[in-house]
Amino acid sequence: LALEPMADALAAGNAVCLKPSELSPNTSKLLAELVPQYLDSEAVRVVEGGPKETGELLKCPFNHIFYTGGGHVGKIVMRAAAEHLTPVTLELGGKSPCFVDRTADINVAARRIAWGKFTNAGQTCVAPDYVLATPDVAEALAERIAVAITEFYGEDPKASPDFGRIINDRHFERLCKLLPVGTVPSEEPSSPLVQVASAVGAAMDMVGRRFNAVTTGRG
């Protein structure tokens, strides 16, 4: 999310000031170390820091600002850019539904939905938020999604090196509050919906545990 816009800007002949997220300090530190080794420091500078440093950075009269993140910070970026009439590209979060009907390959659709939803623990702006399926394929799709989740992350997702961790405590607490809302008490234990919920629940149970990755090992 940081490197692709940087590459585009450089390819178009621009200089770049790159500010990685403070929520992933290890990645930020790595970029600050690697970028000067491989790219001209006159063309690319990496700035580390938190909200205070970002606020100071936004006071500069850039020619263009490209921001990827949440809506709250997006508003701050837009207000700061307005002081200099700086053009802004905001790549914010959104709702991403999937629609599946009988023309789809159910196995392929299920695997792609499961992959898209759980990559980086769903912390991407294009992660599917919900699935709309026609009645003639809904049951088969639900069954295949449950299978796909288990295939990707195993019966015990916390042991999977491919299942991401939640990036900060605030987001972790928000997800924990949402978990009771997602229960389906009226469904039979063998129903496809419960099978999906069980597979998701196994993954969410892992998310709901406070591992070192949540507090000290952030990427």
What residue spans do the PLM features occupy?
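Periplasmic-binding protein-like
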Residues: A7, H64-T68
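ALDH superfamily catalytic-core signature
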Residues: L39, H72-G219
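Conserved small-residue-rich beta-alpha loop and adjacent elements
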Residues: L1-E42, L85, N107
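A structured beta-alpha segment of the ubiquitous adenosine-cofactor-binding alpha/beta core
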Residues: R45-N63
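Hydrophobic/aromatic ligand-binding patch that stacks against planar heteroaromatic rings
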Residues: D8-A9, E56-L57, A80
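Phosphate/pyrophosphate-binding betaalpha-module
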Residues: L39-R45, K59-C60, T68, H72-K75
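Short beta->alpha connector loops at strand-helix junctions that form conserved
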Residues: N14, K19-S21, E48, T68-G69, ...
